[in-house]
């Protein structure tokens, strides 16, 4: 399965650079190992979440909920893929 997720600008470049290899997310999407995610960079703005046009894809390699609040999971990501910049 594929998931499209928002990611704040302050974290996005660290994912691109390989410094961040996990995401803590609310598990409202029933994530599974092997699922793919596309992270869409942006920031909250006056008209909702404002996207920059940069996206990057990855694969979920491990899921754990140890030590997290109920309903949250830590998604380990790998196979960080293509960075797309779309200014439109």
PLM feature spans:
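Catalytic phosphate/metal-binding cores of nucleic-acid and nucleotide-processing enzymes, i.e., regions
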Residues: 1-88
